[in-house]
A protein has these predicted regions:
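Conserved N-terminal phosphate-binding loop of PLP-dependent enzymes in the Aspartate aminotransferase
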Residues: 1-297
Length: 297
């Protein structure tokens, strides 16, 4: 999102829970502790992880009530990409959503990164998490390169919104953009790209995990479907983030013909989010490029 309202809500790129960064979001916004099992306060292997992380929603709801705002909604990127693509505890988002609804808020699922089959097991990230949202935002893959964004909601919510705002868009619902979006849906179904995602993503994750045996700089490999994170550290025992090495490897991979992204509060996590047509050969090329780059460190 590029509007002032969305920017005011986004903690992307900063640790929003750190005291010196809390003012980076608007006063009517509260951020939650990311359900991050690699370097978060509660880590993989501990019991009750979903409950422990979800409890932070109670704190946020109470603070909003005390400040006189109340709770309007939970807005969440269901891939948690900006948090470094953590392995989210099973049931976490469902528990948070229940707390928000009990406080009178709605659930807004941002599916720009995870939607259109990228979980592999489901078409949408909210389905993977077992949550039914009130509003869904969609972009990027929806048009396969054609500029298109979509907001999906219920007739009741849309009617109330239009009655109170009178929002009008000159380009909203233009036929060419809609045709592009429908064509993307047809291809996903006809070519069974969710099955391709399930197969290739597991193959790629296996290859990336095998690199850990050869390269000490890889601290963790995680993710689900075609959203995979590889965390780079300077020391596996202390889990010290190493953004400098990550950037060097990323740029060397680019020289080798493979593009990746960068995520996480420390800027040390590879974001690997390939297109749905990504093949096993493509995955092998990515793993080989990362291996070669790390051998050159």
């Amino acid at each position: 999102g590029i509007t002032e309202a969305i920017v005011a809500m986004s903690p992307e790129g900063v640790d929003a829970m750190a005291p010196d960064n809390r003012e980076r979001v608007a006063p009517h916004v509260r951020t939650l502790i990311a359900p991050e099992l690699y370097r978060g306060p509660w880590r993989k292997g501990e019991k009750g992880l979903a409950d422990k992380y979800a409890a932070d929603a109670d704190r946020a709801i109470d603070e909003l009530d005390e400040a006189g705002y109340g709770t309007a909604s939970l807005m969440v990127d269901t891939s948690f990409c900006s948090n470094g693509i953590p392995d989210v505890p099973k049931g976490y988002l469902k528990k948070v959503a229940a707390k928000v609804r009990a406080a009178g808020g709605m659930i807004i699922a941002d599916e720009v990164q995870y939607g259109f089959g990228r979980p592999g097991t489901h078409m949408w990230g909210y389905e993977y998490h077992g949550v039914r949202p009130d509003i869904v935002t969609i972009g990027k893959p929806v048009g396969d390169g054609f500029p298109l964004g979509v907001v999906v909601t219920t007739p009741a919510i849309l009617h109330a919104f239009m009655e109170q705002t009178g929002l009008f868009s000159t380009f909203g619902g233009n036929p060419m953009a809609c045709a592009a979006g429908l064509a993307v849906l047809d291809v996903i179904e006809r070519e069974d790209l969710l099955a391709n995602c399930r197969d290739v993503s597991q193959h790629m994750k296996t290859g990336l995990t095998e690199l850990m045996a050869r390269h000490e700089c890889i601290g963790d490999v995680r993710g689900h479907g075609f959203v995979t994170g590889v965390e780079i550290v300077s020391n596996r025992d202390t889990r010290e983030p190493d953004a400098k090495t990550m950037v060097w490897v990323m740029n060397r991979m680019r020289e080798l013909g493979v593009l990746t992204g960068r995520e996480g509060h420390h800027g040390n996590v590879f974001k690997i989010r390939p297109p749905m047509v990504f093949s096993r050969d493509n995955a092998d090329a990515l793993v080989t490029a990362m291996d070669q780059a790390m051998r050159e460190l």
